[in-house]
């Protein structure tokens, strides 16, 4: 989307050269509270961290099943998953489940409960993009 006043002010404050991102191999690892059950089998990475490119952030999740990504919401973020080669899982959003695999793209609007299940013979491998469409609440 177009840059709004928040984006312009943030870019001016950061004083960075674009693009500000990292290669997958150099990405920052993180674990979220709802993902504690997958910490040993799946890895979550930030490729471009929140708030540094205005309202956008990007990352990558990879690992093996069986596993579960607990149901959670993002109050400020719309989110897209792009399923990468070898990736396969059951994705649930707002109570509806669908099986996704390589080449599929999901969209989840802000405040929508969502999570995933990865079967024993599946792998999680997806790139995510998030955007705080209306800016961040805090």
Which residue ranges define each predicted feature?
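Extended, charge-rich intrinsically disordered regulatory tails
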Residues: 134-138
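A generic "binding-loop/recognition-motif" signal
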Residues: 76, 87, 96, 112-113, ...
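Conserved short histidine dyad/triad with adjacent acidic residue
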Residues: 56-75, 88
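Conserved metal-binding segment of the jelly-roll/cupin
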Residues: 1-2, 100-120, 129-131
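A short beta-strand-loop-beta hairpin characteristic of the jelly-roll/cupin
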Residues: 80-102
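Conserved hydrophobic/aromatic beta-strand scaffold that supports enzyme active sites
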Residues: 60-62, 80, 97, 105-107, ...
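A short, N-terminal "cap"/entry segment at the start of jelly-roll beta-barrel domains
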Residues: 3-65
């Amino acid at each position: 989307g177009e840059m709004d006043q928040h984006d312009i002010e943030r870019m001016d404050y950061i004083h960075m050269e674009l693009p500000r991102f990292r290669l997958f191999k150099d990405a920052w690892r993180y674990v979220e509270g709802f993902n504690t059950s997958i910490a040993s089998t799946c890895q979550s990475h930030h490729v471009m961290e929140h708030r540094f490119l205005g309202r956008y952030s990007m990352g990558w999740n990879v690992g093996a099943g069986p596993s579960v990504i607990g149901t959670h919401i993002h109050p400020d973020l719309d989110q897209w998953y792009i399923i990468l080669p070898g990736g396969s899982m059951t994705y649930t959003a707002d109570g509806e489940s669908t099986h996704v695999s390589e080449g599929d793209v999901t969209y989840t609007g802000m405040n929508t409960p969502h999570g995933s299940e990865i079967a024993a013979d599946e792998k999680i491998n997806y790139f995510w993009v998030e955007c705080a469409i209306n800016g961040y609440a805090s």
